[in-house]
Each structure stands twice: as structure tokens, then as C-alpha cells.
Amino acid sequence: MKIKDGGLGADDIKVMAGAAGGPKWLIFGHLDRYLFGSYFQSRKEPLYLIGSSSGAWRFASASQADPLAAMQRFEDAYIGQTYEGIPTPIEVSAEADKIVTHLLGKQGTREILSHSFLRLSFMTARARGWAGSEQRFKLFAGLCMAVLGNFVSRRFLGWFFERGLFYDPRDVPPFAGMQCLPLHTIPLAPENLGKGLLASGSIPWIMAGVKDIPGAPAGTYRDGGVTDYQMDIPFLNGQDGIVLYPHYQERVIPGWLDKKIAWRKPNAANMANVLLLAPSPDFVESLPDKKIPDRDDFYTYKGRDKERVDKWKQAVAISLRLVDEFVEAVESGKINQIAQPLMI
């Protein structure tokens, strides 16, 4: 109703969310550049960022002193990753570590933790029992049990994975009291930011888990998307404001294991003040292969990395349209008519 009544201003936004989803984030590269390089630049009040996996990496780039340069480093490193044959989890983790190191640069950690108004938070999943093992049989069994437990009830996922919320300790985010699953809140510090970001994107089975993160409870930390794929959390926890959520689809899927569970929906109260920006079917049709880039592209274009890289770069270029449409909707006031209640 706030947008219907008064439009959208940069200061109306209190939280910005970024989903996991591998390369799907690429279509928001230009929108992120506009938002963090221009739209939010005069802001004084804290803007809380919450992401999982690639969403966390996006926001770590955005929270640096020169966000445009950091975003370009991230985009270049992410698109440029290549693998010989079928990579091992250790090899994929090593490549991901290179991406995180490259996007942070020499001063990124310090700049993120001293940013004047951006407050970075991101999700990880602390594995329990065999879900935390790197032995393939035990890990497979642990993940299978997690799938079965989650199918019965999302709360049962907490038997296998606990939330690990890394947050900027200068201001506790409004969503820090999230429930449903066991939660560890972990203050960000120079010693743990890089390892935490790597953990947030460490896909189970595909990558090795991250251990011995300073300031975090002992254990193995995996991709934040396991518990919070597209995030069903109390973003505002009763506070005023809007949650800006650029998302690659209209459906919000709480956890990664919920992707095939059609009836698993987010809590309507958590979505009450969420402004979801989703691409239209026409936009998706205009992309190479008529789809948003995804992890399957690594398999589709195996041995043809140049072709994959070219198509991903084309998708990034085409996504400039999303910036134009957002700016036009906000500045013209048309967003008042365009915005519709989010269907849960």
C-alpha cells in the first residue's frame, strides 16, 4: 500500500534481499550498478543487505568503496571460471575462493566493514552429523536424510542444517531474530568475512564445506541456500519500510530443498512489505537460449567455455533493459500502477 499511495523513494527501502541461484544473478549486474552506484548514494540511514550464496557475493561487491569496480571484478571472475573434465569438490572450492578473493581485492574487507550506510549480512548453513562430512557415502546419506526430513516439514531440516547468519555488528539487522530453524548469529570481522562468503556459496556435494571460521561455532559451513535459497525470513520484523528484492522469478522458494515441493510457500507475513522485481517472460525469451543463465550451462557447454562465456556476456548486456524499466517506472510514478500484491 505504501508504494500505491506514495511511490518509491530510495529512503523508503530498509532491506535489500539477494537470492541464491548460481549464475542467475548475472541479469541483475547492471541493476546493481545503478542501485549502488547512483540510486542509494545520497542515503544516510543504514540499508541492510541480506543474501545467500551468489546473492551474498553480489552484496559484498556492492558494499565496497568503489562498487562499480568491485562488481566488475566479481562479474569478470564469475563468468571466467572454467573447469577441466569433471572437477572435484576441492577444485571447485579453489575456483570459488579465487572469485571471492578477486571481488574483495586488497581493501574490500575493510571497506565493507566501514561502509557509511550499507550493512552486509549473509546466510550460511552449519551442517550437522553426516551432512557435515566430506566422505562421499556419509555426505550422500546425510543429504538424503535432510531431503526426507525437509519434505515432511521444513522444521525437520534443522536436524541436519542450522542457519549461520553473518552480520555487520555496527547495527543488528531487523531479521536477526528469525526463527523456524536453529540460528547462530555471527558478527562479521576482518578475520571471518572472506571465509564466511566462501561458505555462503559452498554448494553441498559440488564443493567442500568450510571449516574453522573465526568467530563462528565450530563445524562445517555450507551454502546458505540450503536453508535460505530465496529467503522466507522476517525481513523487517514489524518495522516500517520496504524490502527491495530483485529476483529472477515470481515464486519465492524458502530453501533449496523446497524447489520441487510446489506447496512449500513463504510466510505471507514475511512477504508483506516485499517489492519483488521479476523479469517478464518476454525478457527471458530475449536472452540467449531463451533462459536466464544457470549452473546447467557448465554441463551444456562443457569443453566450449568460450561459447558459454559469450552467451553469459550477452545476457548481461541485454539486462540493461531492466535498469531502464526500473528507472522509468520509479521516476515517472508508474510504479504506483505497476506494483501488485505478491501472490503467495
Task: Give the location of each predicted region.
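Patatin-like phospholipase
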Residues: 1-48, 61-344
